[in-house]
Swiss-Prot record:
GO biological process, one term: cell division
Recorded domain comment: Consists of 3 domains; the N-terminus binds the ribosome, the middle domain has PPIase activity, while the C-terminus has intrinsic chaperone activity on its own.
UniProt protein name: Trigger factor
Gene that this polypeptide is encoded by: tig
UniProt EC number: 5.2.1.8
Species: Moorella thermoacetica (strain ATCC 39073 / JCM 9320)
Amino acid sequence: MKAAVEKLDKNQVLLEVEVEAPRVQKAIDQAYRRLVKQVNIPGFRKGKAPRFILEQYIGKEPIYNEAAEIVIPPAYEEAVAEHQLEPIDRPEVEIVKVEDGEPLVFKARVEVKPEVQLGPYTGLEVERQEVEVTEADIDAYLKRLQERYAELEVIEDEPAAAGDIVTIDFKGTVDGQPYPGMEGNNYPLELGSGTFITGFEEQLVGARVNEERTVNVTFPSDYHEKDLAGKEAVFQVTVRGIKRKKLAPLDDEFAKDVSECETLADLRQDIRRRLEESQKQRVEAAVRQAVVEKAVAAATVELPEVMVERRIDARIRELERNLQAQKMTLEEFLKNTDKTIGDLEKEFRPGAERDVKTELVLEAIAKAENIQPSQEEIDAEIERMARIFRQDPDTVRKNLGDLSVLKYDIMIKKTIDFLVEHSKPVPPREQGAAGETAETAEATPA
């Protein structure tokens, strides 16, 4: 087989492939055997008509076309591999010549991954935050634990206060008319949690059991449901019950109740360790993101539109899945937000372009540095997945198929590892931006 490649504009290439005559003849014979079984020819049992009779009945062209469908796909793949091309779309194929006893010639026009002009990607200066956990962080964490494990006391003779959980019946109107979804009974609401629209919960502070209150609120101008954006609403609310959190004292018994620690001092030490580990992970994630962003910004590449469009489509499909989890269709979301699919595509384009460029640049760096996953790394990742899914490693390997996605993911991770290892850490301009507080940490110690 012979294959020549010509570079065209906009990441397009033209392959001209000539497949040797014996291989073509074998495909023609195979095509005849396929077609003769599909055609009813008077005087012959199905599949038994000689080729010249079949040709008289349907002509030579269908046989040649069938032969081309047999020959071209594998020949195209061989030509792509020979010239180390990376197609990103389906090829446009033109059959130039196919006949008995002759080579088959075809042309394939296809868009390939573009060449990336890499900028500097080693020695990049990246800010690295210091990991620091204060006593105040630990105190705040403990406060959250107290809140989480608090007992609820029924309040009968006192007014509701911020932090109390009130059980309410409510019915809302807009412009004097009931509105779907603005009604509920026996709804538990923590005052100050921000669960309801701004101003709603504040107006229930001071209410007593069985008290009725009129609550007036205004929906934000950017409210997700466009029909309510900027509108005033009136709610008739009845407080059916009040419960108040009773916090346990911070002592050794509390430590035993909420963790495996024996003393409060041990619990504080365990919390410090957890917060430090969580901060380290956040700092490392920030460093990895920063070094990738710098390497990508320094590179130049013409983004293939087909890759960008696919990434946009993927984002829309992800949105659709998230909406389904909320019992909402994409059509309902578009109606509520007064948007069109075109608006979403425009909104998602910058992120899609950023993702595509990042992918291309990381691949180019991996190629330049000859970064590939080792068999040990592949096996280790399969073992890790097997532990997570509680499956046998052989089962995981079988489910993964040819492992191409796994190998790619490992390659990208190793490439980012390389960038981090060859970066230059510098002190942050403002200390503490990556520091973690108890508000963002995991709430349950071991």
